[in-house]
Amino acid sequence: MPTILTQADIQQVLGELKGWAWERDALEKTYRFGSFREAMSFMVRAAFEAEALNHHPEWANVYDRVTVRLATHDAGGKVTAKDVELARRFEKISWVG
């Protein structure tokens, strides 16, 4: 089972990840894009990143917004290093449109 991050670990990570929050025991962020097409482009690329890590987000799309929620199912739905790595990868591709 992956190691669950402590509250202190999570607060440190949130200081590094712009716009992310700790909500309901998960890392969460809503991205806003210029159009539905840009939002879908991000989701497709994000899906490839998730597959590469074999770690998948909970997410939703409404027009130009994508809300991402990251927690590790194997760790009882808590935040682990896998979630942090995926959030960092999403940040690197979030400019994509």
Curated annotation (Swiss-Prot):
Assigned EC number: 4.2.1.96
UniProt-listed Pfam families: Pterin_4a
Catalysed reaction, written as an equation: (4aS,6R)-4a-hydroxy-L-erythro-5,6,7,8-tetrahydrobiopterin = (6R)-L-erythro-6,7-dihydrobiopterin + H2O
Gene Ontology molecular function: 4-alpha-hydroxytetrahydrobiopterin dehydratase activity
Keyword Lyase listed: yes
Gene Ontology biological process terms in this record: tetrahydrobiopterin biosynthetic process
InterPro entries associated with the record: PCD_sf, Pterin_deHydtase
Protein's UniProt keywords contain rRNA-binding: no
Record keywords: Lyase
Enzyme class at the top of the EC tree: lyase
Source taxon at top rank: Bacteria
Annotated HAMAP family: Pterin_4_alpha
Family: Belongs to the pterin-4-alpha-carbinolamine dehydratase family.
Listed name of the protein: Putative pterin-4-alpha-carbinolamine dehydratase
Organism of provenance: Opitutus terrae (strain DSM 11246 / JCM 15787 / PB90-1)
